[in-house]
């Protein structure tokens, strides 16, 4: 294991906590332990996995993809043709005694991996569409899974391009299949995807990425960033509702294919050195 933390050994720490290229960090807490995954671009092992007891001192404990060139030879050191188009913004979650990592390889499709021990071997699978076809296509990125209290599973993701929108998908309870997608429809670029072929549109802003979904104290939170000012103003957007698909003003609940409205708040951290936000609820 490789130590990469920011602790100074005297009860203090320095920022950045990890002074290296560990971009798109996604941490979770399981009991008294923290685990985090970060982007690796074309480098193997793909998707770095780290462990901490205090969110300050981190150790690299493994990687999800042992060799990315098993996905495509273009990842290999011989060709090196995947640098700016591969392992971005994965998400790690713990569900029913197992660790899950979801990641879209920008040039190669949607994948998920499962492990009993996050420091051990990960079993990698290709995510499938509603027809059980592998979701091998370009463009989709920044996925995040979510298991609701009723056992139903969901995924948020977005597709960079002309219509850089965010989508909410229904998954099978085991997280292996998107129930409202068709890979041939998902292969198209620069369009607004249709429900039952490409999920439910949740954000029609200009540059939706960094998608995350959480449930806390009776509220669902869908979080993403906008880094372009062409649609909404750039910043971090937090959507909140007591119904996952939102609620209309007359009280009607949203549902798959018919998204309603959320409480929404935008945070712009570009011009502030520090920021603290207390989450309601």
For the regions a language model picked out, list residue spans one by one.
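Carbohydrate-active catalytic/glycan-binding domains of CAZyme proteins
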Residues: 1-281
């Amino acid at each position: 294991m490789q130590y990469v933390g920011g602790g100074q050994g005297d009860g203090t720490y320095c920022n950045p906590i990890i002074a290296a290229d560990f971009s798109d960090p996604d941490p979770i807490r399981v009991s008294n332990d923290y685990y985090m995954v970060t982007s690796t671009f074309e480098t193997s092992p793909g998707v770095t996995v780290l462990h901490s007891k205090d969110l300050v001192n981190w150790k690299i404990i493994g990687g999800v993809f042992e060799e990315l060139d098993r996905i495509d030879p273009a990842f290999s050191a011989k060709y090196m043709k995947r640098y700016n188009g591969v392992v971005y913004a994965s998400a790690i979650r713990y569900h029913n005694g197992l660790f899950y990592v979801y990641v879209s390889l920008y040039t190669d499709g949607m994948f998920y991996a499962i492990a009993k021990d996050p420091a051990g071997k990960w079993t990698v699978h290709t995510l499938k569409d509603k027809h059980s076809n592998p979701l091998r296509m370009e463009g989709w990125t920044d996925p995040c899974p979510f298991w609701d209290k009723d056992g139903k599973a969901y995924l948020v993701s977005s597709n960079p391009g002309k219509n850089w929108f965010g989508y909410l998908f229904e998954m099978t309870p085991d997280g292996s299949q998107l129930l409202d997608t068709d890979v041939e429809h998902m292969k198209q670029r620069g369009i607004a995807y249709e429900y039952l072929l490409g999920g439910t549109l949740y954000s029609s802003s200009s540059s939706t990425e960094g998608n995350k979904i959480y449930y806390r104290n009776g509220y669902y939170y869908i979080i993403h960033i906008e880094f372009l000012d062409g649609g909404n103003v750039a910043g971090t957007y937090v959507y909140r509702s007591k119904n996952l698909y939102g609620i209309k003003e007359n009280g009607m609940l949203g549902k798959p294919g018919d998204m309603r409205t959320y409480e929404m708040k935008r945070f712009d951290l570009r011009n502030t050195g520090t920021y603290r936000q207390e989450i309601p609820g």
